[in-house]
Amino acid sequence: QTEMARQHDAGMISYRIDASSFPGAYGEMIEETNVLVANHIAVKMQVIALAQRYAIGDLSQDMPLLPGEKRVITDALDAAKANLGAINAEIKRLEGAAAAGDLSQRGNVAGFEHDFADMVAGLNQLMQTTDGNLAHVSRMLRAIADGDLRARMEGEFHGVFARIAGDANTTAAQLATI
Protein backbone atom coordinates (compact mmCIF):
# COMPACT_ATOMS: atom_id res chain seq x y z
CA GLN A 1 0.00 0.00 0.00
CA THR A 2 2.87 2.35 0.74
CA GLU A 3 4.22 1.88 -2.78
CA MET A 4 0.79 2.44 -4.32
CA ALA A 5 0.39 5.64 -2.29
CA ARG A 6 3.84 6.81 -3.38
CA GLN A 7 3.13 6.03 -7.05
CA HIS A 8 -0.24 7.77 -6.97
CA ASP A 9 1.23 10.82 -5.22
CA ALA A 10 3.82 10.92 -8.02
CA GLY A 11 1.02 10.99 -10.60
CA MET A 12 1.07 7.32 -11.61
CA ILE A 13 -2.63 6.75 -10.97
CA SER A 14 -2.65 3.55 -13.04
CA TYR A 15 -0.35 1.82 -10.56
CA ARG A 16 -1.85 -1.22 -8.84
CA ILE A 17 -0.44 -3.69 -6.32
CA ASP A 18 0.34 -7.09 -7.81
CA ALA A 19 -2.29 -9.21 -6.04
CA SER A 20 -0.78 -12.43 -7.39
CA SER A 21 2.24 -11.88 -5.14
CA PHE A 22 0.07 -12.47 -2.09
CA PRO A 23 -1.47 -15.85 -1.32
CA GLY A 24 -5.09 -16.52 -0.38
CA ALA A 25 -7.09 -13.96 1.56
CA TYR A 26 -4.27 -11.40 1.37
CA GLY A 27 -4.32 -11.56 -2.41
CA GLU A 28 -8.10 -11.13 -2.38
CA MET A 29 -7.82 -8.07 -0.10
CA ILE A 30 -5.19 -6.58 -2.40
CA GLU A 31 -7.37 -7.22 -5.46
CA GLU A 32 -10.36 -5.60 -3.72
CA THR A 33 -8.17 -2.61 -2.84
CA ASN A 34 -7.09 -2.36 -6.48
CA VAL A 35 -10.75 -2.42 -7.57
CA LEU A 36 -11.64 0.25 -5.01
CA VAL A 37 -8.81 2.49 -6.22
CA ALA A 38 -9.75 1.87 -9.87
CA ASN A 39 -13.37 2.80 -9.19
CA HIS A 40 -12.38 6.07 -7.50
CA ILE A 41 -10.06 6.93 -10.38
CA ALA A 42 -12.77 6.06 -12.92
CA VAL A 43 -15.07 8.66 -11.33
CA LYS A 44 -12.29 11.26 -11.45
CA MET A 45 -11.67 10.47 -15.11
CA GLN A 46 -15.41 10.83 -15.84
CA VAL A 47 -15.36 14.26 -14.18
CA ILE A 48 -12.30 15.29 -16.19
CA ALA A 49 -13.79 14.07 -19.48
CA LEU A 50 -17.02 15.94 -18.81
CA ALA A 51 -15.19 19.11 -17.73
CA GLN A 52 -13.21 18.97 -20.98
CA ARG A 53 -16.47 18.78 -22.97
CA TYR A 54 -17.95 21.68 -21.02
CA ALA A 55 -14.74 23.69 -21.50
CA ILE A 56 -15.20 23.62 -25.29
CA GLY A 57 -18.90 24.44 -25.09
CA ASP A 58 -20.34 20.94 -25.48
CA LEU A 59 -23.09 20.80 -22.88
CA SER A 60 -24.79 17.75 -24.39
CA GLN A 61 -23.57 15.28 -21.77
CA ASP A 62 -24.47 14.85 -18.12
CA MET A 63 -22.61 13.33 -15.21
CA PRO A 64 -24.27 10.06 -14.22
CA LEU A 65 -26.13 10.24 -10.93
CA LEU A 66 -23.64 9.03 -8.35
CA PRO A 67 -24.82 7.38 -5.14
CA GLY A 68 -24.43 8.47 -1.55
CA GLU A 69 -21.79 11.02 -0.63
CA LYS A 70 -20.46 10.95 -4.19
CA ARG A 71 -23.68 12.71 -5.22
CA VAL A 72 -21.92 16.05 -4.54
CA ILE A 73 -19.86 15.40 -7.69
CA THR A 74 -22.99 15.00 -9.81
CA ASP A 75 -24.56 18.06 -8.19
CA ALA A 76 -21.45 20.18 -8.83
CA LEU A 77 -21.25 19.23 -12.49
CA ASP A 78 -24.99 19.70 -12.92
CA ALA A 79 -24.63 23.22 -11.48
CA ALA A 80 -21.69 23.97 -13.78
CA LYS A 81 -23.68 22.80 -16.79
CA ALA A 82 -26.74 24.80 -15.72
CA ASN A 83 -24.69 27.98 -15.24
CA LEU A 84 -22.91 27.56 -18.58
CA GLY A 85 -26.28 26.98 -20.22
CA ALA A 86 -27.73 30.07 -18.56
CA ILE A 87 -24.90 32.36 -19.69
CA ASN A 88 -25.15 30.88 -23.18
CA ALA A 89 -28.90 31.53 -23.27
CA GLU A 90 -28.42 35.12 -22.06
CA ILE A 91 -25.77 35.78 -24.72
CA LYS A 92 -27.98 34.27 -27.43
CA ARG A 93 -30.96 36.34 -26.24
CA LEU A 94 -28.96 39.58 -26.47
CA GLU A 95 -27.45 38.56 -29.80
CA GLY A 96 -30.92 37.82 -31.17
CA ALA A 97 -32.23 41.17 -29.98
CA ALA A 98 -29.28 43.03 -31.52
CA ALA A 99 -29.65 41.14 -34.81
CA ALA A 100 -33.33 42.14 -34.84
CA GLY A 101 -32.38 45.78 -34.27
CA ASP A 102 -33.57 45.92 -30.66
CA LEU A 103 -30.59 47.40 -28.85
CA SER A 104 -32.70 48.37 -25.85
CA GLN A 105 -32.49 44.87 -24.38
CA ARG A 106 -30.18 44.30 -21.41
CA GLY A 107 -28.92 41.16 -19.78
CA ASN A 108 -29.78 40.22 -16.22
CA VAL A 109 -26.47 40.88 -14.41
CA ALA A 110 -28.04 39.98 -11.05
CA GLY A 111 -28.77 36.50 -12.36
CA PHE A 112 -25.06 35.69 -12.53
CA GLU A 113 -21.98 35.81 -10.34
CA HIS A 114 -18.29 36.61 -10.77
CA ASP A 115 -16.99 36.50 -14.36
CA PHE A 116 -20.41 35.54 -15.74
CA ALA A 117 -21.87 38.72 -14.24
CA ASP A 118 -18.94 40.66 -15.73
CA MET A 119 -19.67 39.14 -19.15
CA VAL A 120 -23.32 40.16 -19.02
CA ALA A 121 -22.38 43.65 -17.78
CA GLY A 122 -19.94 43.94 -20.69
CA LEU A 123 -22.61 42.91 -23.16
CA ASN A 124 -24.98 45.43 -21.59
CA GLN A 125 -22.36 48.14 -22.05
CA LEU A 126 -21.92 47.11 -25.68
CA MET A 127 -25.68 47.22 -26.27
CA GLN A 128 -26.01 50.59 -24.50
CA THR A 129 -23.07 52.19 -26.34
CA THR A 130 -24.25 50.95 -29.71
CA ASP A 131 -27.85 51.97 -29.01
CA GLY A 132 -26.83 55.44 -27.85
CA ASN A 133 -24.49 56.11 -30.76
CA LEU A 134 -27.00 54.89 -33.34
CA ALA A 135 -29.64 57.09 -31.69
CA HIS A 136 -27.34 60.09 -32.31
CA VAL A 137 -27.07 59.15 -35.99
CA SER A 138 -30.83 58.66 -36.24
CA ARG A 139 -31.58 62.06 -34.65
CA MET A 140 -29.20 63.78 -37.03
CA LEU A 141 -30.61 62.06 -40.11
CA ARG A 142 -34.14 62.90 -38.94
CA ALA A 143 -33.15 66.56 -38.52
CA ILE A 144 -31.60 66.65 -41.99
CA ALA A 145 -34.72 64.97 -43.44
CA ASP A 146 -36.77 67.71 -41.76
CA GLY A 147 -34.60 70.34 -43.46
CA ASP A 148 -32.38 71.28 -40.49
CA LEU A 149 -28.94 71.32 -42.11
CA ARG A 150 -27.40 72.80 -38.97
CA ALA A 151 -27.79 69.46 -37.16
CA ARG A 152 -24.53 67.92 -36.04
CA MET A 153 -23.49 64.89 -34.07
CA GLU A 154 -21.95 66.19 -30.89
CA GLY A 155 -20.44 64.19 -28.10
CA GLU A 156 -17.59 61.82 -27.48
CA PHE A 157 -17.45 59.08 -30.09
CA HIS A 158 -14.78 56.43 -30.59
CA GLY A 159 -13.71 54.10 -33.37
CA VAL A 160 -16.27 53.52 -36.08
CA PHE A 161 -18.72 55.77 -34.25
CA ALA A 162 -16.25 58.67 -34.44
CA ARG A 163 -15.90 58.04 -38.17
CA ILE A 164 -19.68 57.93 -38.62
CA ALA A 165 -20.07 61.17 -36.63
CA GLY A 166 -17.39 62.86 -38.72
CA ASP A 167 -18.92 61.64 -41.99
CA ALA A 168 -22.42 62.67 -40.90
CA ASN A 169 -21.25 66.14 -39.86
CA THR A 170 -19.34 66.57 -43.13
CA THR A 171 -22.40 65.46 -45.09
CA ALA A 172 -24.62 67.98 -43.28
CA ALA A 173 -22.08 70.75 -43.83
CA GLN A 174 -21.83 69.94 -47.56
CA LEU A 175 -25.61 69.84 -47.92
CA ALA A 176 -25.83 73.24 -46.23
CA THR A 177 -23.66 74.75 -49.00
CA ILE A 178 -25.98 73.59 -51.78
Q: In which residue ranges do the predicted regions lie?
A:
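Polar/charged heptad-repeat coiled-coil helices used as signal-transmission/dimerization stalks
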Residues: 2-177
